């Protein structure tokens, strides 16, 4: 602080004025003793002196001690109200930020009050929204009406005959006016009086809220307790004369509290001087007793001085207790002189701003201790307080270089004294350290945000009601499942009203099949099924979740239909069992017949082929002799041509018979292969050598492209026949000037290494839709070119069968007009354990 003057010697407060009066009392006693000593010889002057003392005593009944006790009650009430208003302000700020946090607001006020409030409620125009603490029959609605009727932002008072003190602050809830109200026992604020004395707390209209002590129990107003009206009490600090219910005279001191909203009352029996009056008056004209009267009067004045000192000590003690009460409530006191820009700070307030204690500082020094972001709002609050009287602002005090920690302070005050042309010149108020409350609010807000995020992230519908059946929170899935408008789901909405709208989306519902308590299943209007679960919370609220079980219901329905279909199928199977048995017998009979017919066919073909080959060999032999003119010229050259045709036709017929014979052996299972180690290059060269003359005669180029290959285990004759068939087909269907190429390569396979052999030609090609028919016996593809060639369609079928017997695969790739590639794979090592591979035609 720029000019820190240390602890203030005195502040402009009512307790200081009373203390000054008490200090001046001893000097008045000595003056009176000196005057009486000078007038002891004159009885008549003695009588007048005694009479003057009596008037002075009557003018200030009760003296400083009684006023101090009234100030003590007022100070205790102010400290109580300051603590409660701090909590109410924090709750009002919380409701402005989050209208749904009504219960958090009530609990925040209850904690901030530090035990000064028994219960806290949030009351809206619709009624009581939330209550925290011990309710004990508090009339919250009446208190809210009284607070609203007062027209003040902060209101204190009492309603009904309950002896409760209510403190309220005005806020907003869903754009409507609402009140946060604290309630407590008013009798706690009135300390236990000493013997014969009494204390009370009253409203400005004279109604007693709380009273303790002699003759005031059960009294409802100041007139009943002290035989005084509000007009009798007056505006000054002096005590007035009253009368107890039993007729005893009382000295009554009154102090306004909370800007006149309450009156603190202290009363004590009047110190009687009636006996002294009688003694003095009776001996006033006696010359024998003036000395005694003077001595008695001196003793009386000394006693009064002693009592004044005692009252002064009591005032010091009461002031100390008041400070302890304020410090215990973490409440600092301050006074701002706006004209002189001087601020008086109590020890607690000075410590809040980073100084070691209280004192008087300049307003600029104080503002420099406030966060730069909040200084303007403090200046604005001071300007408003000067104009309208009320001061209420929250600001942060950063950590100081001396090591003081950063604090949040709520400062509240009121204009003091009669306002002038520029408004109030002084603002008196309290400062509350609300750092812990701010931290708690931030943590609570963070926890609530995490809870809301978690609730929003769950796939189920979720809704939470409080114990009064009011809506606290829900997630988007709840709104979606029950097709509810956002305006229906405002915080605080009645559960019955929300359920009425939610029921419109439900087609039917019934208890869960397993009979679980609080669980039911519902079919929605859109066809979905949900499982609704309800349970009570520890605070008496209700949690409801709704999970989508449409998939489960669909599966159950499908399972039910499947069970019905299965039962029908079983019944049908039982009915057709005899028919199936009869069909099985017929099938077995037909199977035997088919196998016999197929075997007979194969045997017939084998026999016929053998019978045909015998005469055919003679035809081929003699035609070859005639063609080569081994026994001389035949004469006409046409005979030689005829013999060539006979030999060519015979060779073709022999090849056809051989194919039929081999095919029959394969179908009859009589074809035996002899697997032996061999080089595929040797087989290929042998096959190419046999067809090379035909290729050259057809004007074709015949190439072989074989790399270094490993030995394989295969049947030499069968592999050679496969290559001859493929080469013959390629030569047969390739036009002149075309080419035929034989290639081989090694392929890696999980079942063992393979050798792939390909025969590629540049012939007429085959359409894609005809490829699948080619490997079947006696199948040929009709084309303009094929009409000029001979064949039975057994070549590829026989080739495929021989490759399959080698555990190989035949593949065909062809493009019409471009050529055909026929390839097959053979395992390097033959195994008795056959591996099935399908024929691939592409």
From Swiss-Prot:
It is an enzyme of class 2 (transferase). It comes from the Bacteria. InterPro entries: HATPase_C_sf, His_kinase_dom, HisK_dim/P_dom, HisK_dim/P_sf, PAS, PAS-like_dom_sf, PAS_fold, Sig_transdc_His_kin-like_C. It is found in: Cell membrane. The chain crosses the membrane at residues 29-50, 283-303, 343-363. Its main location: membrane. Its EC number is 2.7.13.3. It is a multi-pass membrane protein. GO terms for molecular function: ATP binding; histidine phosphotransfer kinase activity; phosphorelay sensor kinase activity. PROSITE patterns: HIS_KIN, PAS. The modification Phosphohistidine is found at residue 610. It catalyses: ATP + protein L-histidine = ADP + protein N-phospho-L-histidine. Member of the two-component regulatory system involved in the regulation of polar organelle development. PleC functions as a membrane-associated protein kinase that transfers phosphate to the response regulator PleD, leading to its activation. This is Non-motile and phage-resistance protein. The lineage of its organism: Bacteria, Pseudomonadati, Pseudomonadota, Alphaproteobacteria, Caulobacterales. The gene is pleC.
